[in-house]
Amino acid sequence: MSRVALVTGGSRGIGAAISIALKAAGYKVAASYAGNDDAAKPFKAETGIAVYKWDVSSYEACVEGIAKVEADLGPIDVLVNNAGITKDAMFHKMTPDQWNAVINTNLTGLFNMTHPVWSGMRDRSFGRIVNISSINGQKGQMGQANYSAAKAGDLGFTKALAQEGAAKGITVNAICPGYIGTEMVRAIPEKVLNERIIPQIPVGRLGEPDEIARIVVFLASDEAGFITGSTISANGGQFFV
């Protein structure tokens, strides 16, 4: 029987690449999204991947959404916490709403999504959780105190939960992408990309969403069962921990 994978923020950008790669690897895949129907509908039509709409910042919405996925596809074996938002501002101009929105989605969202699937993974003695953090959770980024704090929190969550899951066959790992060539990044003016961003990256290029997706597929596999609590940096050498 095929294992079931759920990817949050799974219909666009890195999340879409992850969803597609997991399906190609033989998983039954569900992709959740929060609000972009214009992206989700063609994604479903083009890939055949089931899409579900809910906001990961709401625990109740996550419980309800996960129940729908499991009713349709079966118990979730692989959870990829990819959903995230930005509300950038210099700290002296940042509002409580900007802070809370990012923390609630990018950090609390991991609790909201993982908690409802955790008991089932424990009962089945198998689970794979992959948290998509960020290079900015490792090094910080000016104008992103909220985002950097949330993504750093994702790494602490990963390490703590890995210790709890290890004896039950559950691995918990994180990936910290650097600049990846998503639609959002490629919308940055070419002059800025070529003169300010790419020179920071020793390999001399942006990463590709598929490169992140391939890491996820490996971490979700049986072959990665001895890897847990790890953070994989995928940033072209831009930052070393």
Swiss-Prot record:
A Pfam family recorded for this sequence: adh_short_C2
Gene Ontology cellular-component annotations: cytoplasm
CDD domains: BKR_SDR_c
SUPFAM superfamilies noted in UniProt: NAD(P)-binding Rossmann-fold domains
Pathway in which this enzyme or protein is active: Biopolymer metabolism; poly-(R)-3-hydroxybutanoate biosynthesis
EC numbers: 1.1.1.36
GO molecular function terms listed in the Swiss-Prot or TrEMBL record: acetoacetyl-CoA reductase activity
Keyword annotations: Cytoplasm, NADP, Oxidoreductase, PHB biosynthesis
Protein name: Acetoacetyl-CoA reductase
Organism: Shinella zoogloeoides
